[in-house]
Amino acid sequence: MAGVALKQEITFTGPTVIGGTLVPAGDYKVTHQMQGTEHVMIFKQIGGKAEAKAKCNLVPLTEKARTTEQRYNENAKNEHVLVEMTFRGDTSKHVLEP
């Protein structure tokens, strides 16, 4: 997977929905894997048991990302839903499937 790091860390300041799974606030290890032809992001809570998976699409950036950023939407239950991630130094952003 050229242009993206296979492992990252991310902190959620509040409960967050990832791929349909609600996880609590905390620090997470994020692993990018290929399952067949699909890209999958796996989130595992550091020091906890929470885990979530989401399919993602890689969207090329015009240059290396200068910062790490996340983009969220809000669902009908007013929960934060992670929809996109960009990690500093990567040349693609991760767009998560709901």
How does the language model describe each region?
Residues 1-17:
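Short acidic, Pro/Gly- and aromatic-enriched capping/linker segments at domain boundaries
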Residues 11, 32-33:
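Solvent-exposed, non-transmembrane regions of integral membrane proteins
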Residues 38, 42-87:
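Mid-chain, structured segments of secreted extracytoplasmic proteins
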Residues 26-32:
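A short tyrosine-centered beta-strand micro-motif
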Residues 24-25, 52, 93:
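A sequence-level detector of short linear motifs
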Residues 89-97:
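Short, low-complexity, Pro/Ser/Thr/Gly-rich segments in the mature regions of secreted, periplasmic
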Residues 6-8, 26, 37-39:
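A generic structural signal for short beta-strands and their flanking turns/coil linkers
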